[in-house]
Design a protein with these regions (language model features):
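A short, glycine/small-residue-rich beta-strand->loop->alpha-helix junction that serves as a flexible
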Residues: 8-17
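Conserved N-terminal ligand/cofactor-binding loop architecture of enzyme catalytic domains
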Residues: 20, 24-95
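Short, well-ordered alpha-helical microsegments
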Residues: 44, 114-116, 140-141, 159
């Protein structure tokens, strides 16, 4: 079984979660092949550096601004729509990876690749089960996308919140 784990190195928790999933899956059997890919780095090293350094700067130097941007992207707003459009554009750049690796399932631990893979499914470009591991403690609109086959959340309190966001 080929398992593709897509994440991003904004902060540290998303990639650590990916590594923990990889370790667990490998222990489950001999015929399991796991590939972890930093989706932003794969798409563009420049994009990766811009987003990760921007995130680090905002989170550490201007946390109030980071909080404001976080809130704006969690509702219908021009910024949230802009990020969604970018993810739609970048989604196609994941296709060579998906075609080469031929995953039986795709697991995501970051909202950007979650939305990208979801877009590929919506457009009918792939028909691969997509599992989203939400590494945050509360749902954010960036994590909620169409055609996600399963969500795994960090705590029971999130289940009701996810239902309120339209996830069934």
């Amino acid at each position: 079984m080929n398992i593709l784990i897509l994440s991003a190195s904004t902060g540290g928790g998303h990639m650590r979660a990916s590594k923990a999933i990889e370790n667990y899956m490998i222990q489950q059997g001999e015929n399991i092949n796991v590939e972890i890919v930093d989706s932003l780095l794969y798409i563009s090293p420049i994009l990766n550096k811009t987003i990760t350094s921007g995130y680090l700067y905002l989170a550490t130097k201007t946390p109030k601004l980071y909080g404001k941007l976080y809130d704006l992207t969690n509702k219908e707003h021009k910024l949230a729509n802009f990020v969604a459009r970018l993810n739609n554009i970048f989604a196609n750049k994941l296709m060579p990876l998906i075609e080469d690796f031929k995953p039986d399932v795709i697991i995501t631990t970051h909202p950007f690749p979650t939305e990208m893979v979801s877009r590929l499914k919506v457009k009918g470009e792939i028909n691969i089960p997509l599992i989203c591991i939400m590494t945050d403690y509360a749902p954010h609109k960036a994590w909620i996308s169409k055609d996600i086959d399963a969500y795994i959340v960090s705590n029971d309190d999130m289940v009701g919140k996810m239902v309120n966001e339209g996830v069934n």
